[in-house]
Structures are given as C-alpha cells and as structure tokens.
Swiss-Prot record:
It comes from Petunia hybrida. Homotetramer. GO terms for biological process: amino acid metabolic process; carboxylic acid metabolic process. Its EC number is 4.1.1.109. This is Phenylacetaldehyde synthase. Belongs to the group II decarboxylase family.
C-alpha cells in the first residue's frame, strides 16, 4: 500500500490558526473594509477612469502560488490599492459615461453585504422562506412601480423572479417558449423553429438562441433604419414571418427592445405584439437599461403594448442603484417557465413543495443555487423611497439633456440619434470634416471619430464608448453613475471639445 506523501513545503511548518467567522474579527475587519471603500469613493476622481494597464500586468505583480500563512487585512487592502486598483476601470466614477451604467448606492452595497453575510441558498421555499417570499413581494412592488399590468404580478396570476443577467432571462424565456411550441408540433420539429429580433437587439439574445438549440440560420435579425429611429418596423416583421411560414418553418419567439444598446431605440410594442399574436409567437420585452426609467410616470408610455407580450425584463443593476447582479423578469404565465425548467429530486422533496402552495425559484432559472438578491433591492427601495429614486433618474436624464444641448450648440458636431433617456449619440460631422480636410465619405469620418474617441479616453479624464449603426460610427455618452453631477458633464464636454479642436487644427 502506498504511504501518504507529505509535501516538504508544509512538513514541519507552524501554521497559525484563525477562526473562519469570529464575530470580533469580522467587526474589526469589516470596519476597515467600509473605511477603505468610503475612502475609495471619496478619492475616485483621482484615478484614470479607464484602466491604463497592459494585458498580463497582474501576473507580473502577484506571486505564482497562494500564501501558506495568513496575511492581515491591512496588508491585503494595501495590495488591493497597489496591485488591483491600476487594473480597474472605475464604473462608479462620476466621469464614467461608457456602455450603460452599472450604478451602485450605499443601500445597494450594504444590501449586498447583508446578503453575503446571511449567505442563504434560496433554491426552494423551505431552504429559506424569507428569501423566496421577499423576492416575490419585491417583484410585485417593482412591477406596480413601473405600472406593469396586473397579469404580470403574483397578485394577478403572473409572477416575477430575479436572475443574474439579461442573457439568462432570454435563455429561460426562449426555452419556455420552445417547449410549449414543441408540445404542439413535436420535438422532432425543433429545427423548424424561428426567432425574430431587430438588428439592434442586444447580442446576448443571439447567444441565448444558440444555447437553446435553435438553428443559427433560423435567427432573423431584421434590419432597422434611421427612418424608423432604428426601431423594429412591424411590416418588416410581418414579411419575415410570412416568408418563413411559406417555407414550412415555425415562428416561435420575438424579442423586442425598450432602449437598445446602441442608441436606446424603442420598438413599437403594440403593433409588434398584435402581429406576433396572429401567429402564436411568444413576445419578450427587453428593457435592460431603460426599464428603470419607467418608475417615473412620464416614461411609462414607452411600455404601451406590454400587456400583449408574454414576458418582460429589466436590470435593476444598471440604473436602479442596485449592485450587480439583479435582472428582474416577469411572466404572465409562469407555469410555461416552470414546466420547462422544474426538477424535483428526492433530496429536495418537502411538504411545502408537494403542497404546491409555495414558489420554488429553482424552477424559474437555469441553475439550482441562487443568491438572496431581493434583499439589496428591498434595501434600496426602503432606504431611498420611490420619490428619491425617481428624482435620481430624472437628474441623470436632465444632465444628458444638458450635454446634448452643448453638443448641438457646437456646429462642428451633430446628434446622431434621438435621446430617449440618458444616452447621447454624437460625432464630429461630415460637413465639418469636409470643410477642414475635404473628407467626402463616411469611412474617413468614421476613422476621424474613432481616433477622437481614443484620444479622449487616453487622457484618463473621462470614459465613453462607441457604436456603429448603418455603417456610421458614433460616440455614446451615457449618464448614470451615482456620483455624476453637472460639473462632470461640463468637464466631459470640455474634454471632447478640446480634443476635437486639437485634431481639427493638426
């Protein structure tokens, strides 16, 4: 029989013992962590917004193996500041205007801390009843807040669940729609299923379609144009469906968007849903970013027609000041989802589940284990109240309007898409570049604006990103970081203007 071999690295070494969950150690280290983060937020503007490091930088700084002996929290936090901070892009910086916001808040962070400290695994009601029931209650609260029809709420026969990301939500709803359709046509016809979206729909939808087993060639990305403000044209959808029907295919699923990633275009829900209903197509409404704005009554008209859809989602972690991750999904018929995803092995059997009087959220998602996400959103709603949350969002939209006005007043620039929420899309215009450099085509204009954006980002002062729509390169300026105020908007515009002036005068 082989003997146990002792690693000489450990043989004879004295190892310090430490408690894994000592209350006093937690209190001391927790205070230090809170102070560390508070100092970070206080000094966040001192850091370049986008990380300036090169790939592989961290491997050169850290040892090639884990420490044998424990290290004090003071040293660990020192290492965070010296080694980790240079590799951070600071999403909470007031000068972060890239992508869409991933906005945080004191309540959101403390809610995350509370959830992590309790560390319950709420896959079923019995596993932690409060986790399940608070999630159901908060989902109804939030649904009422954005004025979702009662049919989406638990109180009206529907229901909501918190998942990680939009991609997870899309996958779950596609699978629910797929299984429901194949019950009618037979599983052997899965290769005939077709899904529809606009060419502006978030790219995660295509990933979800691929994972769900739908053939890649049966994904219809219907082109949009500036004439419809890059929203999905209902007649274009109808033509695509009719062509597929003639080819013997089975229309399955339509993903609509309220606030597309590139330009925050809004698809016309009502006519799209009416067409989908004619053909028995499941309609999902993705409002990942813009859904948060719908807590304000003046933006709820963008959801007109959602009563005709099957499911709706938005990300509270984007613009509702709740830390990543927290994607909220509502369904009018949750049984379609649970029928597709439910499992009930003997190890999870219990009287509450067997009674069918409780929600088991394991059957509403891909994974079994799940976090206590509702706790942080509950804290956000309670700590700030609806009135303050609405005003935070309105202030971001007003700041975006201010930036848009600054751009419009400079004749060298042009606004490239309607500003529906807090995103402004702009560029240095073809006319300005034609006057200065005799540019005559969009390729040259695109190249100039790409160089302008990189110059702006390299300064470290602000961070913005770009998109390309109909072959046109445009710079995206998204307001939504929790610390942003008007001076940051003015500073960002000065950076844009000064870098443009420098390049135009070169």
């Amino acid at each position: 029989m082989d003997t146990i071999k002792i690693n000489p690295e450990f043989d004879g070494q004295f190892c310090k013992t430490t408690s894994l969950l000592d209350p006093e150690e937690f209190r001391r280290n927790g205070h230090m962590m809170v102070d560390f983060l508070a100092d970070y937020f206080h000094n966040i503007e001192k850091y370049p917004v986008r990380s300036q490091v090169e790939p592989g930088y961290l491997e050169r700084l850290l040892p090639d193996s884990a420490p044998i002996q424990p290290e004090p929290i003071e040293k660990i936090l020192k290492d965070v500041r010296s080694d980790i901070f240079p590799g951070l892009t600071h999403w909470q910086s007031p000068n972060f205007f890239a992508y869409f916001p991933c906005s945080s808040s004191t309540a959101g962070i403390l809610g995350e801390m509370l959830s992590a400290g309790l560390n319950v695994v709420g896959f079923s009601w019995i596993a932690s009843p409060a986790a399940t029931e608070l999630e159901s209650i908060v989902m109804d609260w939030l649904g009422k807040l954005i004025n979702l029809p009662k049919t989406y709420l638990f109180s009206g026969g529907g229901g909501g669940v918190m998942q990680g990301t939009t991609c997870e939500v899309m996958l779950c709803t596609i699978v629910a729609a797929r299984d429901k359709m194949l019950e009618k046509f037979g599983r052997e016809n899965i290769d005939k299923l077709v899904v529809y979206a606009s060419d502006q729909t978030h790219f995660s939808f295509q990933k979800a379609v691929k994972i769900s087993g739908i053939k890649p060639e049966n994904f219809r990305a219907i082109p949009t144009t500036k004439a419809t403000e890059f929203s999905l044209n209902p007649e274009s959808l109808r033509r695509a469906i009719q062509e597929d029907k003639k080819a013997g295919l089975i229309p399955l699923f339509l993903c609509t968007s309220i606030g597309t990633t590139s330009t925050t275009a809004v698809d016309p829900l009502k006519p799209l849903c009416e067409i989908a209903e004619e053909y028995g197509i499941w309609v999902h409404v993705d409002a990942a970013y813009a859904g948060s704005a719908c807590i304000c009554p003046e933006f709820q008209h963008f959801l007109d027609g959602v009563e005709h859809a099957n499911s709706f989602s938005f990300n509270a972690h984007k613009w509702l000041f709740t830390t990543l991750d927290c994607c909220c999904l509502w369904l009018k018929d949750p049984s379609s989802l649970t029928k597709a995803l439910s499992t009930n092995p003997e190890v999870l059997r219990n009287d509450a589940t067997d009674s069918e009087q409780v929600v088991d959220y394991k059957d509403w998602q891909i994974t079994l284990s799940r976090r206590f996400r509702s706790l942080k959103l509950w804290l956000v709603l309670k700590s700030y109240g609806v009135a303050n949350l609405r005003n935070f969002i309105r202030s971001h939209i007003e700041m975006a309007k201010h930036f848009e006005e600054l751009v419009a007043m400079d004749e060298r620039f042009e606004i490239m898409a309607p500003r529906n929420f807090s995103l402004v899309c702009f560029r240095v215009s073809l006319l300005a570049l034609e006057k200065k450099f005799n540019f005559v085509d969009e390729t040259q204009v695109n190249e100039f604006n790409a160089k302008l954006l990189e110059s702006i980002i390299s300064s470290g002062n602000v961070y913005m990103t770009h998109t390309v729509v109909e072959g046109v390169y445009m710079i995206r300026f998204a307001v939504g970081a929790p610390l942003t105020d008007y001076p940051h908007i003015d500073m960002a515009w000065n950076v844009v203007r000064n870098h443009a002036t420098m390049m135009l005068n070169a």
